[in-house]
Amino acid sequence: MKDMSNKKIFKKYSRVAGLLTAALIVGNLVTANADSNKQNTANTETTTTNEQPKPESSELTTEKAGQKMDDMLNSNDMIKLAPKEMPLESAEKEEKKSEDNKKSEEDHTEEINDKIYSLNYNELEVLAKNGETIENFVPKEGVKKADKFIVIERKKKNINTTPVDISIIDSVTDRTYPAALQLANKGFTENKPDAVVTKRNPQKIHIDLPGMGDKATVEVNDPTYANVSTAIDNLVNQWHDNYSGGNTLPARTQYTESMVYSKSQIEAALNVNSKILDGTLGIDFKSISKGEKKVMIAAYKQIFYTVSANLPNNPADVFDKSVTLKELQRKGVSNEAPPLFVSNVAYGRTVFVKLETSSKSNDVEAAFSAALKGTDVKTNGKYSDILENSSFTAVVLGGDAAEHNKVVTKDFDVIRNVIKDNATFSRKNPAYPISYTSVFLKNNKIAGVNNRSEYVETTSTEYTSGKINLSHQGAYVAQYEILWDEINYDDKGKEVITKRRWDNNWYSKTSPFSTVIPLGANSRNIRIMARECTGLAWEWWRKVIDERDVKLSKEINVNISGSTLSPYGSITYK
């Protein structure tokens, strides 16, 4: 600041000095003119004594002096100093340019290394994603529909996952490419990472396509999204032209499946944004929570190749030396949001499959899982019935998706073909970025999103009404006791039990006798007892049947026969 002030003062007085110099020139001209007039007067007096000379007026003298000064100023001999060409201003520009060059040449590597190494954070906490918190829910609910009674049971569950490969959606590809810089903050956990854009050092990337050898590694001078994408395209084209041998490359398939209970649960289970699944597959979360539908989602990740970025030895290795600590701090780097480095990106395609049914069977998950694994379910009657009453949807992201963008069918064999088709890498079936992995720039530790969520697991069991068919063919007097409970639930999910009994309990019945006792679909804890009169004083009544846990069925056939001393009884189901 002091130097600049001195320069301004010097500039000011230089201009004053210039004005004084001009004034001095004018003075000299006036003096010289006056001396010349005196000399001319003396000569005139010598030659002519009688004639008085006419003195020259001061106005004329000044006018002549001014004219001479103008002539001098306009002559080529005069040095002209235009304001824009002042030597001092030019010097200031040169000095500023020099200072800028010094700043760009200044090395901030040590400063950035020290700061990033000193960042204090917990890897699990900065990338913690807390999903839903469940407080109130109805644990059980009973719904009566015609001859059906549906019990919807809800249980509170916890899920905690730490996936390291994060699904890529189209909206974030420009900040999830190999060697991209990100912030470990909430945006990252929600698959909407914040990018750190700054001047970078050259970066080496490697593609794992077979046969390329050292040609598989290239250096990108300025690792922006556009430049890295171009480099990857060049590597892929080079492989197709020189190393593929005209052959296709089979995909490496990763497979995960999960029943769907809530948005946060399926996000954590499959490591994918529920908005993608909801938008592409159309998941009816409301019907699932009501127990009206059961849904399973399977994700097939088919990887054609992976591109990796060389990990830095030190944090500052990724930055140009001119990048300052203040710049990184302005762009969000802090203890709460430490920097991340995208270490690798997988390219290929992802197939999402939705299996949906309104079946209330407890075997739905097993049936769906068997179908996905290619098991022949036709030999299993229960599984076959479930799949026949199910619908299937497949959505392909990446690859030649134009052929199988979205398929909805009742035939699971069609879904199997979608999964198998275009599962090889070729020019006609290109790869797209499907997932990526990031590391903390501080220590190259893998950054995994710590998903913590509560959800309600909803299961529904459907019961059908039944009946008891009593048949007495024995040569004795018989008595029955038929008891059961009817189950309902109040608005808080608490079980309400109503005791029921047959009106003819303990009434004596002679052979032949038969009757039908209807049972509601919510009947449980069925007890059936039948006894016969022996006529023996020491054992007047003898039990023929005594079953305390008879299961509800469409038809429960209770038969008694035989003699007083050799009675026979049986219970069969239909």
Curated annotation (Swiss-Prot):
It comes from the Bacteria. A cholesterol-dependent toxin that causes cytolysis by forming pores in cholesterol containing host membranes. After binding to target membranes, the protein undergoes a major conformation change, leading to its insertion in the host membrane and formation of an oligomeric pore complex. Cholesterol is required for binding to host membranes, membrane insertion and pore formation; cholesterol binding is mediated by a Thr-Leu pair in the C-terminus. Can be reversibly inactivated by oxidation. This is Streptolysin O. Keywords: Cytolysis, Hemolysis, Host cell membrane, Host membrane, Lipid-binding, Membrane, Secreted, Signal, Toxin, Transmembrane, Transmembrane beta strand, Virulence. One of its GO terms (biological process) is killing of cells of another organism. The keyword Electron transport does not apply. It is found in: Secreted; Host cell membrane. Gene3D superfamilies: 3.30.1040.20, Perfringolysin (3.40.30.40), Perfringolysin, domain 4 (2.60.40.1430), Thiol-activated cytolysin superfamily/Thiol-activated cytolysin, alpha-beta domain (3.90.840.10). A motif (Conserved undecapeptide) lies at residues 532-542. The gene is slo. It comes from Streptococcus dysgalactiae subsp. equisimilis (Streptococcus equisimilis). Residues 37-52 have a biased composition (Low complexity). Belongs to the cholesterol-dependent cytolysin family. Pfam families: Thiol_cytolys_C, Thiol_cytolysin. One of its GO terms (molecular function) is cholesterol binding. The keyword Calcium does not apply.
